[in-house]
Amino acid sequence: MGAIIDKAKAAIDKVDQLGDLAAKIFTEFDRDRILRDADAAEERVAQSATALPLAGMLVSVKDLYDEAGVTTTAASKLLQGRPAATRDCEVIARIKAAGAVPFGRTALSEFAYSGVGLNPHYGTPGNVFDPEGIPGGSTSGGALTVALGLADIALGTDTGGSVRIPSAINGLYGYKPSRLWMSGEGIHPLAKSFDTAGPLAGDLQTAITAFEVMAGKTLPAQDGKPAPIKIGVPAHAFVNDLDDRVRADFDAVCKKLNDAGHQLTEIDLGFLAENAVINKILVAAEAHKIYSRDFKALETCGDPRVLNRMRFADTLSAADLIDAYAKRTDVIAMFSSAMADVDVMISPTLPMMAPKIAEVEADFDRLNAMMLRNTSYLNLSDACAISIPVPAGDGVAPGALMIAATHGHDFAVLHAARRIDPLLRG
C-alpha cells in the first residue's frame, strides 16, 4: 500500500467523522471508487518518467463535471437517475493524467444558479468560519472540502462568481480563468457564454498548478527583477456601498501596495454597473433554453428560487436578447479600453462579509445579487480574475481581494497574485 492510498484513506476517515455535514458537502461520496482512483494514481505516478504536477493530490469534483460511470446531477433532483456519463470530461482526464485522485462529487446551488450556496435538496452547510453563515456559491461543497482539509483542490465553475465567492468566504484562493482558455467539454452548462471551469485551493501555488493542468498551459517564469505592477483601482462600481470591514480591508491593501512601490491608478469602470442587467438577462435566457422543457417538473422537485430566476427570461423578447448580446460586446470592448494603461485591476471580491443562512433565506434576491455584484462584473466583461485572502488574524474570517485582467491575460493576473499575496500575508 502506497502513500497516495494512505492519504485517500485518511481523508475518507475525516469525511466519515463529519456526520450529517457530509451530506451537505457531497452529492455522492463513493469510497470504493476513490480508493480505486487512488490505486490508479499510485501506479501512474510510479510509472511516470517525470514528476507529475498533481501527484497524490485529492481533488473534489463539483457535480457538474462528467466522470465515467457516474450520473451528473447538478445537485438537482431533476437529473437524478439519468444515464451515467460514458467517459470522463476533458478536465477530469487531465487531472488524473497529472496524478490526482478525484475525491467525491460536491454539492452546489441547484444548476449552479446562485452566489450564496443554498440548496433545499442536500441542505446548506455553514462556512468554515461560521456554521450559521452562508458557504458561498455556487461551488459551496467544493470550497468546504478544501477549507476543512479534506481535499487539496476543488474543481468549480464560475458563471457569475461561483469559484471566487465561496473562495472569498472560506479563506481560499479561487481562480476564474479566461473563458476560452478552459475546456467546457463534459461540464453541465448553465450559460455557455459565461461558464468557466476553475480551481479552488488553500494556497496560491496549488491553485496555479491546478489551473495549468486544467488549461493545459504553463505559467512562464519572470526573468530578472520585475517592474512595479501597474494596478487599476476602480473609482466606481466595485467600491460603492461596501460594508465597513470590507472598506477598511481594501484601503489597507491599497496602502500596502502603494508602500511596496506599485503604481496605483484610478480607473472608471462605472459602465459595468450601468450595464449589470445584461448579466441577468443573458444568463437567465441561456439557462431557460436548457431547462424550459423541464419547468413543470421543477415546480415540484426544484428550488423555487432558481426556477424564478430562469423564468425571468419569459419576460424577454427576441429584441431584448439581440440588444443584450450587442451591449455585452460593447462592454467587453469598453473594459479592454479602460484597462489599456494598467497590468491588472484590483477590488474587493465581495462588497460585504458573509451573511447568515437565515438572512439569505429571508431576503434571497437582494443578498444574492449583492454577493454576486463584484464578481459578475468580470463575467460580464469576459475577464479573468483570482480571489485571494486578506488575512485578519487567527480565528477571524479573512477578507478577500480580487485581481483581474482582460480576457487572455491570465499570466498577468497570476504573476501579480504571486507578488501581491506575500504582501498581504506579511
Where are each of the predicted segments found?
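Flexible, acidic loop-helix segments that line cofactor/substrate-binding pockets
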Residues: 25-28, 227-237, 267-280, 303-316
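Short glycine-rich anion-binding loops that position phosphate/pyrophosphate groups of nucleotides
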Residues: 64, 350-353
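Short, surface-exposed loop/helix-turn segments at secondary-structure junctions
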Residues: 76-78, 278, 322-323, 353-372
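Short helix-loop capping/hinge segments that flank enzyme active sites or metal/cofactor-binding pockets
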Residues: 54-74, 228-230, 282-332, 336, ...
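Gly/Ser-rich catalytic/binding loops embedded in alpha/beta enzyme cores
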Residues: 1-159, 260
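Acyltransferase
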Residues: 5, 39, 245-268, 292-297, ...
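Structural helix-boundary/capping segments
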Residues: 5-6, 17, 147-239, 251-260, ...
